[in-house]
Amino acid sequence: MESLQNHFLIAMPSLHDTFFERSVIYICEHDAKGAMGLVINKPLGIEVNSLLEQMDLPAEQVSTDLAFNANVMMGGPVSQDRGFVLHTSQPYWANSTDLGCGLMLTTSRDVLTAIGSNRSPEKFLVALGYAGWSKDQLEQELADNSWLTIPATNALLFDIKHEDRWPQASRALGFDAWQVSAQAGHA
């Protein structure tokens, strides 16, 4: 299967998993060993500025950017105590991975300090936890019609409100996801 890195997984309406129902997941990595992604539309109930305050991070300049007050996302059920910042490409921080397509994933505290200062990435999304799949697990879920895929866009990642991301992603498919059957191969 071709890599789905830099794609979105869109939960099928028939997926009734309590965590992944109506989820949109940005796939950060996908190779023969498995896949890793971040749920981008499930808020944790805490804003980024509150998270910075809880971590006692100094803020040289409080950003007026909408993202500064954006919700921290529940990135997935794995390692929910671990933070991830998905952001537009900027100078590297301590633990940054270039994902291509002008995006980076950073897991170090220094990017959070930068978010509270004038060195913030232009656009960013903060998440706690991630979604992970072992070898061939995601491929099986795709074969089971749990997910639809589309290429990722920065607009959906950063410019659309979290509650509008699943409907927007579904519309980007070019059809109404609610009218797609979860059953494959039956007429």
Swiss-Prot record:
A Pfam entry, by short name: DUF179
Record-linked SUPFAM superfamilies: VC0467-like
Superkingdom of origin organism: Bacteria
A single GO cellular-component term on record: cytosol
InterPro entries: AlgH-like (IPR003774)
Protein family per UniProt: Belongs to the UPF0301 (AlgH) family.
PANTHER family: UNCHARACTERIZED PROTEIN YQGE (PTHR30327), UPF0301 PROTEIN YQGE (PTHR30327:SF1)
HAMAP family: UPF0301
Stated name of the protein: UPF0301 protein Sbal195_3177
Organism lineage: Bacteria, Pseudomonadati, Pseudomonadota, Gammaproteobacteria, Alteromonadales
